[in-house]
Design a protein with these regions (language model features):
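Blade-terminus and WD-like Trp-Asp/Gly-His loop motifs, strongest in beta-propeller folds
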Residues: 1-3, 46-54, 96-104, 140-148, ...
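A flexible loop/linker signature enriched in serine peptidases of the S9 family
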Residues: 7-23, 34-47, 54-73, 84-94, ...
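Short loop/turn segments that connect beta-strands within beta-propeller blades
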Residues: 26-30, 76-80, 121-125, 166-170
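Short flexible coil/turn linkers enriched for glycine and charged/polar residues
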Residues: 29, 79, 111, 156, ...
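Structural signal for short hydrophobic segments within the conserved structured cores
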Residues: 33, 83, 128, 173, ...
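Acidic/polar loop patches that form or flank catalytic/metal-binding clefts of enzymes
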Residues: 76, 81-85, 172-174, 217
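Conserved blade-ending motifs and adjacent loop-strand segments that build the rim/top face
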Residues: 85-95, 128-140, 176-187
């Protein structure tokens, strides 16, 4: 590589700002160049495509709003232009990973209280869900052949274990079970997903965690966590 891309907050009073930008600098030294001027939010996580044409990155639209949606952007290193790949995708894109042909990306996104793997091609510009299940997937990596993905899978009952994901079907295979013996004799809670109407009519997803050996005829203390 001939250059390095990084995130920096080069603004007055950076401690009070979320306006970080992508910068590139030659590896041999030289002047740094801002790749995202005019983008006032939080730009982060740059990843070069294998062919060197693109830099994928995540960007928040609004300054000063740390919970804004992380949009998936592409920086064209030939034209210098930035473009949003998935403007209609209603979730934040995390852990951006290129396919080896530089024609698509894998990433993780939160949906209905879970974290799933998605993919999006540069040509199709649509997010396609790869995995399903009541879990959170993180630490995403793509195998050299592109046929498999690797990640850590956690759930509300289990800590992280390593899994392999079929990139086409989304089938998940557990590769480790370090905590299996410890959980073998445990009584685990019953967990159900529910939807509730908000005051504005929108639906809010929530998890209801019932104690082990739950008896619906009995009354239990209730704790609300938001």
């Amino acid at each position: 590589g001939k250059e390095l891309c990084y995130t920096a907050r080069r603004v007055p009073n950076p401690e009070a700002s979320t306006d970080s930008s992508l910068w590139v600098v030659p590896v041999g030294g030289g002047e740094a160049k801002n790749l995202t001027p005019g983008m006032p939010g939080y730009d982060q996580d740059p990843v070069y495509s294998p062919d060197g044409r693109w830099i994928a990155f995540a960007s928040m639209a609004r300054p000063g709003f740390e919970a804004d949606r992380l949009r998936l952007f592409l920086h064209d290193r030939q034209s210098g232009k930035n473009q949003e790949l998935l403007p209609d995708f209603d979730a934040g894109a995390h852990e951006l990973r290129w396919t080896k042909d530089s024609q698509a990306l894998f990433f993780t996104a939160e949906v209905e209280g879970t974290t799933q793997v998605y993919t999006a091609s540069l040509a199709g510009r649509q997010a396609v869900r790869v995995t399903n299940g009541r879990h959170a997937l993180s630490g995403l990596q793509v195998a050299p052949d592109g046929a498999s993905l690797f990640a850590l899978r956690t759930s509300m009952e289990r800590p992280a274990e390593v899994v392999r994901i079929d990139a086409k079907t989304g089938a998940i295979t557990a590769l480790t079970d370090h905590n299996g013996p410890a959980f073998a004799d445990l009584a685990l809670p019953q967990i159900d997903g529910e939807w509730f109407p908000a005051t504005d009519g929108k639906q809010i997803h929530a998890w209801i965690v019932k104690p082990p050996n739950f008896d619906p005829s009995k009354r239990y203390p209730f704790v609300l966590y938001c």
